[in-house]
């Protein structure tokens, strides 16, 4: 079998690795694979669309692949440059380089009949083709910049997309900076702007609200004393969600909407408890409309450094807030006199370069109406990216039509889309690793069975929103593990010792956990769990944090699931007892049998 992989980012590299390794885990012949990358190095967005001081918002423990870890276990978040270094090391470790063709642009993918494909590529001005049996599209979500249509955009002296941002020097001297977009990149650039001595003012524009979520568990002060076991190095949030009763042993009626609703209310209550607001972590303004906050799922912005500068003018100073914060309060940075103005989305920019904002009911809109006209000198479009597949023929589907876990379309299994889902909390690379495990098994006819219909892991999409491919990271990873029989049970974890069992139950949903059993089981998985990952449970959390997590997990997921499982058991027993009684009562007695015989 021959397979082409398009794209040399994390998703493409992990796809290449599993295709090359398939014959070591399954009884199949070695697969011939070629990876085509248009740039001159691997890494994708992390190599070419990043900036100074850029840091991943997903933890190193979660983002790195199951069988190759970052060398420094004390590091929680990698810089973009460090992550590219990690990916290059991944290529070294698994011998991927001979199968990677850099500076090679895929011009066209077309079908040649009998289920095969032809890849047309260009390199150094030369065009060539490569025929194959399957194609893995791993070109990524962050390639083509999304440019909003705003009349008068060209009337601002300096305008550029965030993909072009490299250094704070680009924001100029003594400038009024406006950032469009409240995602991680937009918030990062706003933070760099407000803390730079070279800029005059910083304004961030949002469409219709956003939600801030910390990427680390907040450090808490109880009666003025910090309680964290590791001050300044709190546990990443994406490692804090336990596996037991959140993913494993969850009743079907709890999983999905009910589980998410309970979890959301828990998050809102926790946010109020430590920051005084339920809108988001220390988020006093810019919240989503109530109907969207309560009924739809949303993507958290995990870049929190800018939020204190936005919230400062809006924080409550009521006696309730003062009392609460004197008892319990998240540790927040001192912003001094610096602030970031929050504004609605621009409607248009007039001939004088003055921005006219859309009117809405948000408090920031009312504040702007009372202030002077705003004329930006620098405008940064942190408006994300759009999906584009110019190389695909018209008879190929796109990821939004891939109905099998977002990987392939039914009936067209030889074309896989890897890494085209976006988690709210989590990371794309580990989900891509789980997706490719499923796709490769299906490709070689080793999938345990048909994929069970299950959309509980999907996030509800906002009809007016740009992103419609959101998933809950932990639920999706667990679902993919179930698909291939790689989700370990309690007893399977226990077979590897108590340390693995503790991490299985209380640790985050990390892919190494899914290498304990199943078709991709790997003997090195228990060692990584014991040497590195167990520390996220036993070494990084205080007694208060562990007890709080146990109690909240039991309340939100554990108790409802246990009660429902018991109810199912009682119903099943009742049915069996009723059936047994019915059978007994329907049998003729011995006397009745004798009378019947005499009559005969």
Swiss-Prot record:
Gene3D superfamilies registered for this protein in UniProt: FAD/NAD(P)-binding domain (3.50.50.60)
Cofactor requirement: FAD
Record carries keyword Oxidoreductase: yes
Top-tier EC class: oxidoreductase
EC number(s) given by UniProt: 1.-.-.-
Keywords: FAD, Flavoprotein, Monooxygenase, NADP, Oxidoreductase
Family: Belongs to the FMO family.
Function: Monooxygenase; part of the gene cluster that mediates the biosynthesis of the indole diterpenes penitrems. The geranylgeranyl diphosphate (GGPP) synthase ptmG catalyzes the first step in penitrem biosynthesis via conversion of farnesyl pyrophosphate and isopentyl pyrophosphate into geranylgeranyl pyrophosphate (GGPP). Condensation of indole-3-glycerol phosphate with GGPP by the prenyl transferase ptmC then forms 3-geranylgeranylindole (3-GGI).
Protein name: Monooxygenase ptmN
Gene source species: Penicillium ochrochloron
Lineage of the species this protein comes from: Eukaryota, Fungi, Dikarya, Ascomycota, Pezizomycotina
């Amino acid at each position: 079998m021959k397979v082409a992989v398009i794209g040399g980012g994390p998703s493409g590299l992990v796809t290449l690795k599993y295709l090359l390794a398939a014959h070591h885990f399954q009884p199949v012949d070695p697969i011939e694979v070629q990876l085509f990358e248009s740039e001159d190095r691997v890494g994708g967005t992390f190599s070419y669309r990043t900036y100074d001081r850029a840091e991943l918002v997903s933890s190193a423990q979660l983002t790195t692949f199951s069988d190759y870890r970052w060398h420094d276990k004390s590091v929680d978040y990698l810089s973009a440059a460090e992550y590219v270094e990690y990916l290059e090391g991944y290529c070294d470790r698994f011998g991927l380089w001979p199968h990677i063709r850099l500076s090679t642009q895929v011009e066209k993918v077309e079908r040649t009949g009998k289920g095969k494909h032809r890849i047309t590529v260009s390199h150094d001005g030369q065009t060539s083709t490569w025929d194959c049996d399957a194609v893995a599209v791993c070109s990524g979500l962050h390639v083509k910049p999304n440019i909003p249509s705003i009349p008068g955009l060209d009337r601002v002296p300096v305008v550029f997309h965030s993909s072009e941002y490299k250094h704070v020097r680009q924001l100029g001297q003594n400038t009024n900076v406006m950032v469009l977009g409240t995602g991680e990149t937009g918030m990062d650039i706003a933070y760099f702007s407000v803390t730079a001595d070279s800029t005059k003012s910083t304004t961030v524009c949002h469409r219709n609200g956003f939600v801030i979520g910390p990427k680390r568990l907040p450090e808490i002060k109880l009666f003025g004393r910090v309680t964290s076991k590791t001050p300044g190095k709190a546990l990443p949030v994406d490692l804090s969600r336990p596996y037991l009763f959140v993913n494993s042993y969850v009743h079907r009626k709890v999983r999905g909407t009910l589980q998410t609703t309970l979890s959301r209310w828990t998050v809102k209550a926790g946010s109020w408890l430590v920051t005084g607001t339920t809108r988001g972590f220390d988020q006093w303004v810019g919240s989503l409309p109530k109907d969207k906050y309560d009924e739809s799922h949303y993507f958290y912005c995990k870049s929190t450094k800018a939020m204190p500068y936005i919230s400062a003018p809006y924080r409550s100073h009521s006696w309730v807030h003062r009392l609460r914060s004197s008892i319990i309060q998240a540790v927040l940075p001192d912003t001094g006199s610096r602030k970031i103005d929050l504004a609605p989305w621009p409607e248009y920019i007039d001939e004088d370069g003055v921005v006219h904002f859309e009117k809405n009911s948000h408090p920031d809109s009312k504040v702007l109406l009372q202030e002077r006209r705003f004329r930006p000198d620098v405008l940064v479009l942190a408006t994300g990216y759009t999906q584009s597949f110019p190389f695909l023929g018209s008879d190929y589907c796109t990821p939004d039509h891939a109905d099998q876990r977002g990987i392939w379309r039914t009936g067209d299994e030889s074309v896989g889309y890897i890494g085209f889902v976006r988690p709210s909390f989590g990371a794309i690379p580990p989900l891509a690793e789980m997706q490719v495990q499923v796709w490769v098994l299906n490709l070689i006819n080793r999938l345990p069975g048909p994929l069970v219909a299950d959309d509980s892991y999907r996030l509800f999409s906002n009809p007016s929103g740009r992103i419609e491919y959101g998933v809950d990271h932990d639920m999706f990873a667990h679902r993919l593990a179930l698909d291939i029989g790689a989700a370990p049970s309690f007893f399977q974890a226990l077979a590897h010792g108590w340390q693995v069992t503790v991490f299985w139950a209380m640790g985050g949903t990390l892919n190494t956990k899914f290498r304990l059993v199943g078709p991709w089981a790997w003997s090195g998985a228990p060692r990584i769990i014991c040497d590195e990952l167990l520390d996220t449970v036993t070494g990084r959390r205080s007694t208060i944090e562990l007890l709080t997590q146990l109690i909240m997990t039991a309340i939100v997921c554990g108790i409802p699931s246990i009660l429902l499982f018991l109810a199912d058991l009682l119903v099943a027993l009742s049915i069996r007892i009723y059936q047994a009684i019915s059978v007994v009562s329907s049998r003729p007695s011995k006397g009745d049998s004798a009378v019947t015989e005499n009559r005969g």
